[in-house]
């Protein structure tokens, strides 16, 4: 027997159906090994603390509910001991959606690759840290793919009100549609915002004023894509005049011909009443066709401050079925990562006369828009007639 037994190494046992799940969990929940990047969906969505139950046919349907707020009015004057006048009650708005399944590109290791790693293990005197690090890098790539997928869907939902998944090489099509009221889809003012002469700030304030008349005094924020903010808003004539006026009144230097920076804009915008804080949206993903973005290019969003919704998730059907009915000749180890949203599966199976070792990452999750009655989508490319 070899002095250093590769089959008893940490790396080899990651595929063991008995010890593998525990070892995988230790690795996948270690922040020094698996990195958590500040992706788009994490900035705008939380994770539903409840797992959506799965029906007998494998379908997991979630319900997004929002209780509509009652408007506050001035109090009624009454005679002593007089009763109150009952107010009209508002109901609960809701919509449903089905949680889809996703899988990242898999890693397949064949016998010659495993043999090379065993020799590397022996040459390093039984130290498999380098081999485990390579495995972690492979899993990290899959986690990044899952994060990008959630971000793409989240950006679509926030800027379009629906998710139509066209990425990857698998199933394509519509996933869900939030029940955003028709009156929440608005256009630009007299001119499209791309026109330097457009009164962008005036239009933003007007949209907010109309929203507050409908919704009441709730804290709002603007979500504007990076390119629109820098290529449209910062080059707008009304914005330039506001910045120049602000800097002149506050005795701040103005360089002729110098463009407006984000810092200059944020200093000056406080002098323009009626516009909520602006959050710049940045999100891009890599797909088989190149770089893509889920956010609709010419859309700005006005919505309540805070998270836009939750990531709805359910259990992976693969784990349940394989643990109950899986072939005994195939070994599998499952573990969670990504705050429980993603499932890593290591599989050992036969391929002809040799074994193969597979690593896959799966996800049954989708973002839901949970402030949809108060979510306003502005098409800045279309002017009002």
Q: What are the functions of these language-model segments?
A:
Residues 53-58, 221-225, 280:
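A structural signal for short, well-ordered beta-strand segments and their strand-loop junctions
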Residues 177, 182-194:
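Charged, low-complexity intrinsically disordered segments
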Residues 189-255:
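Charged, long alpha-helical assembly modules
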